[in-house]
Amino acid sequence: MNQVYESWMKGGHQHVATCSDCHVPEGFVSKWLFKAENGLHHGYAVTFKQNPVSFQATDKGKNIIQNNCIACHSEYAAYSIDATMKKGAPGSEPLSCVSCHRQVGHAHNF
């Protein structure tokens, strides 16, 4: 986890956003359900020594990050992101904020 924190410190949002600002959903109920679920997963991983070596966002996590980008940057995102556009060959993922701004939150790809 230290590598993730260090890369955030080198990224573009270290002075304006915390981990939760990008990685936790907005809204009281959504936020606390998310924190409870992640706390259980983290507790299990630590207890049974199954900490991931690398971190990859799940589809749910990618959706949360996208929604939080749009929430903070709504004045730009409303005119910039067309989720129906594809970034590559047919069948590839739709474009998202991090399709182009991959290293904004972290200086390295996590």
Question: Residue ranges of each PLM-predicted region?
Answer:
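Short sequence/structural segments immediately N-terminal
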Residues: M1-F110
